[in-house]
């Protein structure tokens, strides 16, 4: 099956979900219909594993806008396959979990599942895209769909603010990324990603290479919540828990990491890129791990833990980026080891983080709270969630016999090996190891502290008073399955490593299959070495900090109020006030003012063009024959037009405006265009009558007195627009480079059977345009009728 067919299948499912929204009896089954989408995509991508492992990549290219090299280019290689599997398989768990989490009585299920399926569709689109502009479209589609999901409970103020904040930051990054893609097109002349990566050596010497890297980093850092662009992610917790579980584990926050991995063969050629990504990742990891301890809300703890874990993965992506420079060197194996660790931890993080969010969702759903000050001793009431969240949290902390331990060991090993890499000095290595270890200690601390406070403290019935707590099996099933995978991957890591991660490494390297022998064999035991020693230190210090320190009392008062997001909120409020003032100044409910502003901007643009290229030069002007009638009609039109500026009576203005229309009708008659004259006459008559009739229903508000300054502006704008239109006519007459389409119409109108050229254009050459114009009028009429009918019924209901 083609990749396009897969995307179409998902779109069909989305359409079915929308149709179900019209029938309330079927709406409760929307989740199960939506579940088909991740199931189909999972089966499809699982089937492709053997082919991709044998270097048999799928690709599809459908021409779209050829002149701009924008095509529907899709490609399934090892990297896109790994991300697609994570998106799809985690999607099955999340979609099923959502069917148990949401209520068909309280929630609009078709709307929710449409948004969620759109979210999955856009993420799969990103990882399959082999065209930069197509990737950008899907990139922004994730921002739009996440906005809709975060604001799903739109009556909640936190949901509204969180949705706006995430949308503003990620769209800003997306626009920066688009600029980077345009720079790539300027440097290479193509939008095809495979072709771009093939020109990496040429691009690195271009003057736009460094600016392009910064644009890419802005896009990646905003999407993957790297410091200081992380602030949108905790606010996104206002979304329903299934959304949080999906967003944090498998979708949007991983898009930035995917972007950097996909373009590693190009971006890794710059040492500056390696430094920035490595140190921003480590700072984000440290900041997220410390800030997680400030939180009382379980979702808040997990949000900052995601920020920290993303920083950890990002740091490994940065260190491993040097492979682009040293593919044939002896140290290439170190870079490959680090990239393998990044991909391995990305997969592990998706599993344990999704399980953690599902556990928190069940606690919130059944206990009615996520506050660790209220929840205590929950192991008695939630034995299954105690097991799920404890194992998942310990995996995140890097405890042995769980999958997180293996990838955390690879992370520590990568840090200690940076001293052997040419990009890092001894001082850099010491700083990297120090920050990484401190961040890992706090990671262990918040993971252990979270489960200790919720499950392993003494149950206090005075604080937590809710009764009749239960854990439905179907509700718990997805998180239990994910929990089982945590130790399973620890014992059989190479099944996933050889079948999924190694092919993904080929994608990171730009399709270089020679990377396979350099890929590490994951072992549970490496003997006593520096990473193991660091792990022991992390576990000991982290345990002490988690058990002995009451972090609820540490971050209090002014310390708790310190937040990076406060700066964003302050800037946002100032911009909002500024925008409101400007809006009120510009939008004064005066149609003529809007027209003047619109035409003014248009004239500025045209005027700038004339300044750059010079005024049009008239070599030979072809003027149609005209007589006394045309001169008289022109004088009448101009005279009436000028008089309209000074007349105060509205009825007189409407009548004179109609007179201008009738004069235009006479122009058409003089030009021997009876069809146009008849059409103009009918339209002008109806319009004038409607204007006059409408006055009987409007209040008799006198027109404001003439303002000399305002009238001068109106006359000036009118005259300038007239000059611009005339100059454009001159330009078109002087242009000989392109053949006129009029000749085609004149030669082909006989074939249409029309009586004249106008009939032929409207009825044949522009038949679809005419059809859709009619449809627009019909839809507009139906919309007006619906609004009027709604208002009538509403007024009737209020009277009753």
Curated annotation (Swiss-Prot):
GO biological process, one term: monoatomic ion transport
Broad class of the protein's primary localization: membrane
Subcellular location, record wording: Cell membrane
GO terms for cellular component: plasma membrane
Gene Ontology MF term list: antiporter activity
Topological relation to the membrane, as annotated: Multi-pass membrane protein
Keywords per UniProt: Antiport, Cell membrane, Ion transport, Membrane, Transmembrane, Transmembrane helix, Transport
Pfam families associated with the record: MbhD, MbhE, Proton_antipo_M, Proton_antipo_N
Transmembrane segments: 1-21, 33-53, 78-98, 118-138, 167-187, 207-227, 241-261, 273-293, 300-320, 331-351, 387-407, 424-444, 472-492, 527-547, 595-615, 627-647, 651-671, 676-696, 712-732, 768-788
Keyword match Ion transport: yes
Domain of life of the native organism: Bacteria
Protein family per UniProt: Belongs to the CPA3 antiporters (TC 2.A.63) subunit A family.
PANTHER family: NA(+)/H(+) ANTIPORTER SUBUNIT (PTHR43373), NA(+)_H(+) ANTIPORTER SUBUNIT A (PTHR43373:SF1)
Quaternary structure annotation from Swiss-Prot or TrEMBL: May form a heterooligomeric complex that consists of seven subunits: mnhA2, mnhB2, mnhC2, mnhD2, mnhE2, mnhF2 and mnhG2.
Protein name: Putative antiporter subunit mnhA2
Organism: Staphylococcus aureus (strain JH9)
Source taxonomy: Bacteria, Bacillati, Bacillota, Bacilli, Bacillales
């Amino acid at each position: 099956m083609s990749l396009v067919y897969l995307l179409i299948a998902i779109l069909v499912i989305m359409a079915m979900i929308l149709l179900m929204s019209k029938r309330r009896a079927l709406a409760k089954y929307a989740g199960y219909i939506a579940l088909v989408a991740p199931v189909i995509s999972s089966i499809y991508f699982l089937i492709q594993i053997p082919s991709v492992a044998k270097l048999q990549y799928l690709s599809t290219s459908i021409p779209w806008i050829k002149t701009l090299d924008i095509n529907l280019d899709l490609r399934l290689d090892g990297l896109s396959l790994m991300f697609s599997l994570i998106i799809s398989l985690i999607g099955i768990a999340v979609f099923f979990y959502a069917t148990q989490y949401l209520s068909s009585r309280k929630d609009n299920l078709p709307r929710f599942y449409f948004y969620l399926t759109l979210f999955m569709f856009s993420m799969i689109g990103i990882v399959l895209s082999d065209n930069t502009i197509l990737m950008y479209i899907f990139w922004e589609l994730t921002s739009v769909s996440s906005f809709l999901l975060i604001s799903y409970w739109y009556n909640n103020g936190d949901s509204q603010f969180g949705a706006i904040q995430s949308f503003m930051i990620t769209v800003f990054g997306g626009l920066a990324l688009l600029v980077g893609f345009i720079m790539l097109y300027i440097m290479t002349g193509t939008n095809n990603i495979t072709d771009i990566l093939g020109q990496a050596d040429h691009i690195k010497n271009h003057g736009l290479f460094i600016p392009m890297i910064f644009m890419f980093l802005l896009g990646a850092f905003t999407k993957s919540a790297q410091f200081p662009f992380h602030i949108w992610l905790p606010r996104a917790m206002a979304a329903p828990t299934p959304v949080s579980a999906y967003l944090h584990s498998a979708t949007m926050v991983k898009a930035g990491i995917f972007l950097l991995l996909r373009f590693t063969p190009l971006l890794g050629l710059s040492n500056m890129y390696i430094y920035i990504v490595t140190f921003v990742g480590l700072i984000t990891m440290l900041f997220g791990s410390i800030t997680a301890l400030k939180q009382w809300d379980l979702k808040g703890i997990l949000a900052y833990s995601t920020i920290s874990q993303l920083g950890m993965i990002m740091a490994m992506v940065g260190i491993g980026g040097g492979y682009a420079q040293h593919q044939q060197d002896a140290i290439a194996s170190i870079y490959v080891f680090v990239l393998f660790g990044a991909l391995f931890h990305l997969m592990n993080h998706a599993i344990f983080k999704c399980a953690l969010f599902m556990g928190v969702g069940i606690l919130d759903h059944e206990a009615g709270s996520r506050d660790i000050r209220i929840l205590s001793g929950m192991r008695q009431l939630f034995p299954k969630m105690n097991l799920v969240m404890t194992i998942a949290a310990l995996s995140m902390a890097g405890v042995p016999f769980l999958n997180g331990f293996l990838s955390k060991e690879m992370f520590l090993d990568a840090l200690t090996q940076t001293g052997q890499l040419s990009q890092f000095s001894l001082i850099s290595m010491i700083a990297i190891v120090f920050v990484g270890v401190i961040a890992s200690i706090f990671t262990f601390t918040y993971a252990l502290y979270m489960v200790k406070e919720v499950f392993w403290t003494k149950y206090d019935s005075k604080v937590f008073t809710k009764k009749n707590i239960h854990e439905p099996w179907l509700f718990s099933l997805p998180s239990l399955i994910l929990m089982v995978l945590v130790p399973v991957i620890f014992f059989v890591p190479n099944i996933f490593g050889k079948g999924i991660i190694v092919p993904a490494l080929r994608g990171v390297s730009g399709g270089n299959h020679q990377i396979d022998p350099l890929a590490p064999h994951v072992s549970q035991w490496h003997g006593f070495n520096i990473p193991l020693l660091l792990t022991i230190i992390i576990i000991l210090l982290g345990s002490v900090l988690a058990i002995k320190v009451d972090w609820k009392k540490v971050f209090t008062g002014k310390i708790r109020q310190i937040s990076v997001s406060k700066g964003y909120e302050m800037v946002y409020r100032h911009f909002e006030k500024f925008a409101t003032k400007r809006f009120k100044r510009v939008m004064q409910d005066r149609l003529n003012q809007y027209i003047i502003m619109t035409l003014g901007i248009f004239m500025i643009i045209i005027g700038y063009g004339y300044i750059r290229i010079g005024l049009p030069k008239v070599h030979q002007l072809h003027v149609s024959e005209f007589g006394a009638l045309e001169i008289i009609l022109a004088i009448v039109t101009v005279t009436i037009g000028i008089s309209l500026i000074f007349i105060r009576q509205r009825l007189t203005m409407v009548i004179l405006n109609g007179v201008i229309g009738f004069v235009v009708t006479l122009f058409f008659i003089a030009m021997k265009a009876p069809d146009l004259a008849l059409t103009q006459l009918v339209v002008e008559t109806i319009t004038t009558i409607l204007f006059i009739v409408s006055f009987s229903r409007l209040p008799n508000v006198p027109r404001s007195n003439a303002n000399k300054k305002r009238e001068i502006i109106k006359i000036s704008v009118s005259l300038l627009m007239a000059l611009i239109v005339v100059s454009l006519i001159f330009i078109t007459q002087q242009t000989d480079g392109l053949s006129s389409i009029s000749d085609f119409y004149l030669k082909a109108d006989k074939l249409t059977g029309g009586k004249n050229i106008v009939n032929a254009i409207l009825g044949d050459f522009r038949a679809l345009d005419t059809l859709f114009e009619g449809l627009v009028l019909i839809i507009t009429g139906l919309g007006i009728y619906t609004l009027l009918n709604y208002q009538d019924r509403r007024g009737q209901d209020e009277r009753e």
